[in-house]
Amino acid sequence: MKLRPLHDRVVIRRSEEESKTAGGIVLPGSAAEKPNRGEVVAVGTGRILDNGEVRALAVKVGDKVVFGPYSGSNTVKVDGEDLLVMAENEILAVIEG
């Protein structure tokens, strides 16, 4: 199944984070914070402005992004994988390089 977001929505695959602290302590799944980074896997057509025009999104498929800890509260399971659906304005930055 393929997920196609509408308007200014973005679908993100959360990055896998190390479950080990810098000191080498392994964290159980419940103690580890969910990562706030991911890869954009789908984007909507754009934001509809007040004048009716559509502004294209600033992110594209394949971008590595950073988002806030409470962003992407809409989680959807697609083919056994949890994906986040969030508005573009919930993305804080694109990781370059």
UniProtKB/Swiss-Prot annotation:
Highest taxon of the lineage: Bacteria
Any one of the GO BP annotations: chaperone cofactor-dependent protein refolding
This protein's name: Co-chaperonin GroES
Molecular function per GO: ATP binding; metal ion binding; protein folding chaperone; protein-folding chaperone binding; unfolded protein binding
Localization, UniProt: Cytoplasm
Key words, A-Z: Chaperone, Cytoplasm
Role this protein plays: Together with the chaperonin GroEL, plays an essential role in assisting protein folding. The GroEL-GroES system forms a nano-cage that allows encapsulation of the non-native substrate proteins and provides a physical environment optimized to promote and accelerate protein folding. GroES binds to the apical surface of the GroEL ring, thereby capping the opening of the GroEL channel.
